[in-house]
């Protein structure tokens, strides 16, 4: 069904009314920018955020800057959906996503250089994930890119599942000081478009995830504590 409805013909039988495509597209990109940022702590209301983006207003605080960055990043992704997965692409997406929001501006668009990073429960502040050492990040990203750019894989993996794996692995490694969740979701969005799932542009993935954020976080946790069985994370995505 995903192949049929998300990647089917864009012609006259499309489920998107041709007369309203631009309106739907703009609305969807704005929604994605808002919800992805709000999941990471942006406190601006949807009404204020929409007005800022639609009127091209200058962001007035960090929350608005996060949403503005997310919107700019999505537009960049749409323009670069045919690119190969690379360290350069990942760093550029992170740079756009975190522009003017990092405690140290130099951390935007570069891998973390220490292990002073953990993933905490937002309420209890309990550590729920300790990422791999920063020393392993460059090689991990190189291996990830090589795997997903392989034109003749030994085993077929459905493109949607491959996109989910990219989402999970970037989140798991936490290659950046901040902005890992936003960047991981953006890379999933990019991969879906790259593989021809054009309807992704018209749907806010983060809005769907935000509605089930606890299940989203549990899917990460269950995967890690059960021998890195990514089936939990895949099942969550396919369900929502």
Where are these regions (language model features)?
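FIC/Doc superfamily catalytic core
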Residues: 1-240
